[in-house]
Structure formats: C-alpha cells, structure tokens
Amino acid sequence: MGQKVHPNGIRLGITKPWNSTWFANTKDFADNLYSDFQVRQFLTKELKNASLSKITIERPAKSIRVTIHTARPGVVIGKKGEDVEKLRKAVAVITGVPAQINISEVRKPELDGKLVADSITSQLERRVMFRRAMKRAVQNAMRLGAKGIKVEVSGRLGGAEIARTEWYREGRVPLHTLRADIDYATSEAHTTYGVIGVKVWIFKGEVLGGLAAVNAAAAQEQAPAKPKRDNKRRGK
C-alpha cells in the first residue's frame, strides 16, 4: 500500500521553517527539547479556547522567546494584558530562564490547517454531521483563495459499528511537489462513540525562492495595514 510522508517534515528547510529555532551543545540539547515540549503542552492546554494555530520558540542568550500564532489575540492578551503576563511568568518558571511572549494574529483562519482541523473536531463533538462539517471547511477555504484542500475523517462516523475513513477533496493538492506550500494538520474529536481523527491538507500555491521567500511573505502579512487616504475634500 502507498504511504504518505509527513508533508511538513519533508519540506523543512525548503518551504517550511522549524517551529523551534535554537542551537545547543550535546549536554543541553535534551533539556531544551523537553522544556520546549512542556511549554507547548502548557500553552495548548491554557489556550484551548483561543483558536491556537502554532507556537514557535527561540532561545536568544539564556532566555526564551515564545511566539503564539492565534486567530483570537484578544483572548490570549486578556484585559490590559493580564493574561499574557500570567503566561509569561508560567513559561519562565517552566524553563528556568527569563521569558518573552509575542502574539501573532492569523488573518485568515479558514486557510490555516490546524484551525480548520480544530473547527471540524469541535463540530463533530457538537454532533454535527461529518459530511456537512467537511464540506463547510472545504467551501470556506476555496472561497478565500486556497488552490486546493483535502479533508479526511476516520473512526466510528455517525456512530456506526464499524470504523471507516471518508475524505473530500477540491482543487489540487500536489504532495510530491516540494515547492508546493502545503499546510498539513491533524486533530482528534472525542465523541460518545469514541475518537474520530481529522486530517487536513491545504494547498496555498507554489513557493518560488525557497525559505527566504516564505519568511518575507510572512513578515509582510504580519505588518500592520496602512490607513487609506481620504482624497475627498473636506467641507467647512
């Protein structure tokens, strides 16, 4: 049977950046890796209602910088920044070094693989029909400019006795093209009948220029929008 390599792993360093960017010697590598895991586990649990996309970690000069990519930055920041300050102190305790937390807003959650997968799982847990949830996710992604999307759900769909896998695809999803920008994510829906797995592949177009072009596009997307000039003459 044909098996699929992880779409994100095979593109690391080509069109996908690493989620943790730091260098450590042999003695400290395992400790840093484990503290990264603990930080991600803690933040994922604390921000389960904040539409969390991904967490990137950097370690400059005996400190840690965590960037939280979310579709709902207001929920993460909290009133007057109280919630994000609590998170910063908790991360500093977990890692044992000074911590800094940055918030990055996901402008189009319908084109983010993790957010789409989480949206489908939340609908399945609310007993929405799986076909309706899949079709809605596909239509929203294509409407906002995706070149292609594939959604797969597997488990006891609709409470059936025998588990099965169903998928729905629209557009192109070229998994073998390394320059293709494929956003892949998984999630799990915990229902009364058992666990239903959800996989999402979103093809956003081809990247020419490698990782440098991806980073430049991401920086441009995060830049604040310039206010539009009003050319109309103001009345007295």
Swiss-Prot record:
It holds the Pfam family Ribosomal_S3_C. GO terms for molecular function: mRNA binding; rRNA binding; structural constituent of ribosome. PROSITE patterns: KH_TYPE_2, RIBOSOMAL_S3. One of its GO terms (cellular component) is cytosolic small ribosomal subunit. Keywords: Ribonucleoprotein, Ribosomal protein, RNA-binding, rRNA-binding. Residues 39-107 form the KH type-2 domain. InterPro entries: KH_dom (IPR004087), KH_dom-like_a/b (IPR015946), KH_dom_type_2 (IPR004044), KH_sf_prok-type (IPR009019), Ribosomal_S3_C_sf (IPR036419), Ribosomal_uS3_bac-typ (IPR005704), Ribosomal_uS3_C (IPR001351), Ribosomal_uS3_CS (IPR018280). One of its GO terms (biological process) is translation. PANTHER family: 30S/40S RIBOSOMAL PROTEIN S3, SMALL RIBOSOMAL SUBUNIT PROTEIN US3C. NCBIfam families: rpsC_bact (TIGR01009). Part of the 30S ribosomal subunit. Forms a tight complex with proteins S10 and S14. Belongs to the universal ribosomal protein uS3 family. This is Small ribosomal subunit protein uS3. It comes from Aeromonas salmonicida (strain A449).
